[in-house]
């Protein structure tokens, strides 16, 4: 199975269409930030889901209300709720939306307690791929200026859920690492400027390549 993963388009979906044309993936995963209201519309999503099954979380630059309305060709919603999963073929994909904050002043804020609660739900579901917009602290969380941009709550969620693959975004800087236990953590980078990743899933394991369109 071939999976393409994108993140942080911020209203520019041209790279996504180029990626789909070049890679012809079975599944498209997105770690959020498609674009806000006024940047992206129903027809923009329709043009993508007509080509490929899509699964996404939302970030801090998304039209969340619109994302909830978008459906794949088979009628399934593209957006994963916090602590929920979606199945594709023999993969279980779990999601936690938004970015960390101490409050709910914005619709895309998520607190430590909510991240922990979502992770606890996912623990019961034997998740293969975990997707968040925010990043785990100290793991694939380098910013473009070389500082760390992750949050501890996502690190704890990663440890609890224990997926084979963890995909995140938000920082606009691609990075990756593999833990000593073999789990792969990938920050997709900045798809608006061409970053993306390709995963081949075979024999219960992922092969990974970071690319630029």
Task: Name these PLM-found stretches.
Residues 8, 28, 33, 59, ...:
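Divalent metal-coordination and catalytic microenvironments
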Residues 7, 58, 83, 97, ...:
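Residues at the C-termini of beta-strands that transition into short coil/loop
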Residues 10-16, 35-40, 60-68, 86, ...:
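Active-site environment of divalent metal-dependent phosphoester hydrolases
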Residues 1-4:
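Extreme N-terminal starter segment of soluble prokaryotic enzymes
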Residues 11, 55, 62-149:
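Conserved catalytic scaffold of divalent metal-dependent phosphoesterases
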Residues 15, 85-89, 156-160, 173-213:
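Binuclear metal-dependent phosphoesterase catalytic core
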Residues 6, 11-88, 160:
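Core catalytic region of metal-dependent phosphoesterases/phosphodiesterases
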Residues 25, 127, 151-171:
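Proline-aspartate-enriched helix->loop->beta-strand connector
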């Amino acid at each position: 199975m071939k999976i393409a993963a994108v993140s942080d388009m911020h209203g520019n979906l041209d790279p996504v269409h180029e990626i789909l044309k070049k890679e012809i993936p079975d599944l498209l995963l997105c770690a959020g930030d498609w674009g806000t209201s006024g940047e992206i519309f129903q027809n923009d999503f329709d043009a993508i889901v007509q080509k490929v099954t899509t699964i996404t979380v939302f970030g801090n630059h998304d039209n969340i209300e619109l994302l909830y309305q978008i459906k794949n060709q088979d009628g399934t919603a593209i957006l994963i709720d916090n602590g929920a999963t979606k199945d594709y073929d023999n993969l279980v994909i779990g999601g936690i939306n938004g970015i960390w904050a101490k409050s709910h002043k914005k619709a895309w804020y998520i607190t430590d307690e909510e991240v922990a609660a979502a992770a606890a739900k996912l623990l019961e579901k034997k998740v293969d791929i975990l997707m968040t917009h925010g990043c785990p602290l100290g793991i694939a969380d380098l910013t473009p200026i070389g500082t760390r941009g992750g949050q501890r709550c996502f690190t704890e969620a990663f440890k609890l859920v224990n997926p084979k693959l963890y995909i995140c975004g938000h920082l606009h800087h691609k990075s990756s690492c593999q833990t000593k236990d073999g789990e792969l953590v990938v920050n997709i980078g900045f798809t608006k400027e061409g970053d993306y990743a390709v995963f081949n899933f075979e024999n219960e394991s992922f092969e990974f390549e970071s690319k630029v369109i």
